[in-house]
Amino acid sequence: MGLYKQFLTKISGNAFVQRLLAAQARDMNHAMGIGTSGDFSNDGEFIVFDLIRKSCQPPYCIFDVGSNKGQFLAYALNDMKQTDYDIHCFEPSQETFRMLTSNSPSNNRVTLNNLGLGKESCEAVLHYSEDGDEGASLTKRDLRHYGINTNHSETVRLTTLDEYCLTHHIEHIHLLKLDIEGHELDALSGAKKMIIGNQIDIILFEFGGCNIDTRRFFRDFWHFFENTPMDLFRATPSGYLIKMEKYKEEHEQFCYSNFVALRKI
């Protein structure tokens, strides 16, 4: 044990120092992009638009999977207003889709789809606490510790990204954004042909507490991308991308974080 660790061990045997250490750990994690997801302006997500402009040529094709009420769409429209683009939005909940439609400007370059993306085309049950719930999930989550009851549900339609692209004659996606509360890996599985075919440049997805309920670990994402022509990174608030060189158990951090997969050049 090094001298610094010995010093910490000696002074840490009380509640006050433990609280200081916990606060320090949270600050350090935040700087590394762990637990930062949720505030678009401060969680590293914005970096994807810089990446698109630097590495891709317009017209840009963007998939917003898990559109909710149009929060990400609003950022994308503002960022892309000086260029050519096509944005495809996916929101399976009927009431939330109505909110999305109401919040979205009339724009023939934006396609709103009242369905979700998954590993197969089917019907599924969506669970949520209230209309427009940002945490709506295809898994009934146990959120009693937050005083939240996901006691509402509805049957929704799902398709796969590969099937959607085939039907709509989409040959390339510049940005695939996934925020579907623990079912991101299912959507990735349904996009395997496009990913393996080098037809997706950038994938942005969230990992966090919802993965506790779906029992999907970071290890599962690591092994998925290990067999694809993409490199995996964690986004930080500064915009710096930390490359996930190899899997470590310490990566299993269930406070919400954003990850970016980039097509290998």
PLM segments and residue spans:
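Phosphate/nucleotide-binding beta-alpha loop and adjacent structural elements of enzyme active sites
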Residues: M1-I265
